[in-house]
Curated annotation (Swiss-Prot):
<keyword id="KW-0963">Cytoplasm</keyword>
<dbReference type="InterPro" id="IPR046357">
    <property type="entry name" value="PPIase_dom_sf"/>
</dbReference>
<comment type="function">
    <text>Involved in protein export. Acts as a chaperone by maintaining the newly synthesized protein in an open conformation. Functions as a peptidyl-prolyl cis-trans isomerase.</text>
</comment>
<dbReference type="GO" id="GO:0005737">
    <property type="term" value="C:cytoplasm"/>
</dbReference>
<protein>
    <recommendedName>
        <fullName>Trigger factor</fullName>
        <ecNumber>5.2.1.8</ecNumber>
    </recommendedName>
</protein>
<dbReference type="InterPro" id="IPR008881">
    <property type="entry name" value="Trigger_fac_ribosome-bd_bac"/>
</dbReference>
<dbReference type="GO" id="GO:0003755">
    <property type="term" value="F:peptidyl-prolyl cis-trans isomerase activity"/>
</dbReference>
<dbReference type="GO" id="GO:0015031">
    <property type="term" value="P:protein transport"/>
</dbReference>
<keyword id="KW-0697">Rotamase</keyword>
<dbReference type="Pfam" id="PF05697">
    <property type="entry name" value="Trigger_N"/>
</dbReference>
<dbReference type="InterPro" id="IPR001179">
    <property type="entry name" value="PPIase_FKBP_dom"/>
</dbReference>
<feature type="domain" description="PPIase FKBP-type">
    <location>
        <begin position="161"/>
        <end position="246"/>
    </location>
</feature>
<dbReference type="GO" id="GO:0061077">
    <property type="term" value="P:chaperone-mediated protein folding"/>
</dbReference>
<dbReference type="InterPro" id="IPR008880">
    <property type="entry name" value="Trigger_fac_C"/>
</dbReference>
<dbReference type="Pfam" id="PF05698">
    <property type="entry name" value="Trigger_C"/>
</dbReference>
<dbReference type="GO" id="GO:0043335">
    <property type="term" value="P:protein unfolding"/>
</dbReference>
<keyword id="KW-0413">Isomerase</keyword>
Length: 444
């Protein structure tokens, strides 16, 4: 086998590989001989078909199979010979496949970058702490009450938290636009499910009233023709409903799995869940800071093929979420056309870069999966189910799930390593701040 390696641009490599014709011819002859023992052709007994007939009937197909196998095998042999680490699948371009002549093909592919992780000591991280107070528990219980509340019509002006039934018609430059009209739409004021300014304009209206609300569409609105555009909505309120909160009694507690122990047990369960949520959120904030620090401190050449694969994974994830949310309405949608690559490119590049950096740290520091940490992570998940032991057994019996937990454990171990070298300061925040997503905090 002859191999020629060329570095084209950046991480791209081009391998020209030659395979002796004899290697292919011998394998074709071997497979045809094996096939002759079992093929059935009219006019011949099984195993007695002449090789010339077998060659005529099956030779071309067998040769194609052998060529495919030989090219695939010789590519990876060449990669090992040149000590390369391909990232993604190669693009194979056959140059010479004629029978009787040496085979030649060109494989174009990317390799993993050489990474030297540095700057861990310069990473600055704030380790947040928070306490779940009695007031936090009261607020959470009120939220749970609202989730089970009944709605009753009111004659007063609408306020935040009310549910309204509205008709509206939107215009831009005096012209109606697609999707800007609806009748009998239910909306909870303060849910932020409409564009900014729309719900605020309805607050203070009574049933039967009509108002014109002026709004400006966000610059990142999904419909390109409306991005940043000013519009007017003529809104008529059909109905205003206020919430009627349920009493804190055994019937209410039972809806959340508390069948004995009354309010004391209910409050204890709520606090326990809040503590769990708080710890998860604080761990997430810490990890995010560490990962941001790693990306900022290390510039990495990113293989385009890995980014492309990550984009596809992110798009599929969002597509699955849309399928779950919209059901049959989302069937047949070409997600690639409505969810373009640019939507996910930045996130995909970051994820690939982080994956490469974390993998390099694991390799350099010789970090192996902490089995006790894996066990702890699985037990944390299992504790939220009615039969924890069944969940634990299920995880350990599912190779894919277990692999995901082991990957998460490795990430936690890397975070711990970085924290041991980084500049860490402590800060106490409220429970509300602790559980609030980072993106939402940034907006505020």
């Amino acid at each position: 086998m002859q191999v020629s390696l060329e570095t084209t641009t950046g991480l791209e490599r081009k391998l020209t590989v030659g395979i002796p014709a004899s290697v292919v011819d011998q394998e074709v002859a071997k497979r045809l001989k094996e096939a002759a023992k079992t093929v059935r052709i009219n006019g011949f007994r099984k195993g007695k078909v002449p090789m010339s007939v077998v060659q005529q009937r099956y030779g071309a197909g067998v040769r194609q199979e052998v060529l495919g196998d030989a090219i695939n095998r010789s590519f990876y042999d060449a990669v090992r010979k040149e000590s390369l680490r391909p990232a993604g699948q190669p693009a194979i371009e056959p140059k010479q496949l004629e029978p009787g002549k040496d085979i030649e093909f060109v494989a174009t592919f990317e390799v993993y970058p050489e990474i030297e992780v540095s700057g861990l000591e310069s990473i600055e991280v704030t380790r947040y702490n928070a306490e779940v107070t009695d007031a936090d528990v009261d607020t959470m219980i009120e939220t749970l009450q609202k989730s089970q509340a009944d709605w009753a019509p009111v004659k007063r002006k609408s306020k935040k938290g009310d549910r309204v039934v509205i008709d509206f018609k939107g215009t831009k430059d005096g012209e109606a636009f697609e999707g800007g009209t609806a009748e009998g739409q239910t909306l909870v004021l303060g849910s932020n499910s409409m564009i900014p300014g729309f719900e605020k304009g309805i607050i203070g209206m009574k049933a039967g009233e009509t108002e014109t609300i002026k709004v400006t569409f966000p610059d990142d609105y999904q419909e390109e023709s409306l991005r940043g555009a000013e519009a007017e909505f003529e809104v008529t309120v059909q109905k205003v409903e206020g919430q009627k909160l349920p009493k804190l009694d055994d019937e209410f507690f039972a809806k959340f799995g508390v069948t004995e122990g009354g309010e004391e047990k209910f409050r204890a369960d709520v606090r326990e869940n809040m503590e769990r949520e708080k710890q998860k959120a604080l761990k997430g904030k810490l990890k995010e800071q560490v990962m941001n620090g790693l990306v900022a401190a290390n510039t990495v050449d990113i293989p385009k093929s890995l980014v492309s694969g990550e984009i596809d994974a992110l798009r599929n994830q969002m597509g699955n979420q849309m399928m779950q949310q919209y059901g049959s309405q989302a069937e047949g949608i070409d997600f690639k056309s409505i969810l373009p690559d640019d939507m996910f490119k930045e996130q995909a590049e970051r994820r690939v870069a982080l994956g490469l950096i974390v993998s390099e740290i694991v390799k350099n520091e010789k970090i192996s999966v902490d089995k006790e940490l894996v066990k702890s992570l699985i037990e944390d998940v299992a504790s939220t189910y009615e039969h924890p032991e069944e969940v634990v057994n299920y995880y350990y019996g599912n190779e894919q799930l277990l692999g995901g937990v082991e990957a998460a454990a490795l990430e936690e171990q890397v975070v711990s390593l970085v924290l041991s070298k980084a500049k860490v300061s402590d800060e106490t925040i409220s429970y509300e701040e602790a559980v609030k997503p980072a993106a939402k905090q940034a907006e505020e």
